[in-house]
Amino acid sequence: MKRRIMYLSFIAILSFCFLLSGCNSAISISALHIGGSEISKDAFLAEIAEREAYNDRQFISEQWYRVKMQTLSDKESSDNKNSDNSYLSISGNVMLSSLQFRSKFRFSVNSESFNSQDDGAEITKNKLSGQVTCVDGEIYTKLKDTDYQKNSGGIKKSDNVTYFCDTLTDNSDINDIIELIKNFDVAALLDGYIDSYRFETMSFFRVPDGYAFSLSGADKVQLVVTYMEGSSRVKTLSLYLFTDKSSDSLASSTSTKLEISASTSRRISAPSNKDKYKMR
């Protein structure tokens, strides 16, 4: 009996120490547990940067939701008749239950309100269903059963539907990318999976062949973004959203990656289960 009490006491002490270490470091994301092994955030970003710099587009598993932005020639498009231009076609079907890549990007997005720099109007919450084609900074949309409409301002209002689209072209600047992330609610792309967050601080640093920056907000929320420059026809914008909404388990966190990349067209499917990281 005495030995049993000593054993239980030892287990209780170890559990208490483990909880303390988990709670203290869960406040700032410093390490991730992927596939049972720990990897630092810097090493994680470096690995992603290395994969993307070498045009490795096979990095897809049950951990990630993935959206691809494809660079296609005019001959492959029936929407663009000008042979002097190329266009970026977003393709994919984003849902929480599945991710199937198709010829057009059909989607359902809940967008949070933000201020339009074009007309100063405040855009409220809306739900958008349709498809989008971006042509050298100009946007062609098909909403519901309407025809394609051309818009070069980046913001379109039609039938109480609002969206924000930004193209990654040769003229894209890192400041444009930063503004895109700051102004657009990335979490809304998950169609209500997580709440809307407001990011308060931003850190910026270089990674191989591109940039990376981090947006941090309240409630232990962090958005890590990598932007790979690559060649003129291969540009990648990757977003890693780390959240911790659990009040009873500070050592648990959910990470979701939404990747927009230039790539060749192909059909891919991804599992539906969300990635869970344990943090120290």
Q: Model regions: which residues?
A:
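Sec-dependent N-terminal signal peptides of Gram-positive bacterial secreted proteins and lipoproteins
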Residues: 4-26
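N-terminal leader/targeting segments and the immediate start of mature chains
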Residues: 19-104, 262-280
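Short, hydrophobic/aromatic-rich segments at coil-to-beta transitions
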Residues: 57-66, 100-106, 205-214, 233-236
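Hydrophobic lipid-interacting interfaces of membrane-associated proteins
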Residues: 64-77, 108-114, 137, 141-146, ...
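N-terminal beta-strand/beta-hairpin edge segment
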Residues: 85-141, 146
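Gly/Pro-enriched, hydrophobic low-complexity segments
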Residues: 87-89, 112, 119-120, 206-279
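Acidic/charged, solvent-exposed loop-and-adjacent secondary-structure segments enriched in E/D, K/R, S/T
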Residues: 142-191
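Short helix-loop boundary/capping segments
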Residues: 173-226, 240-241
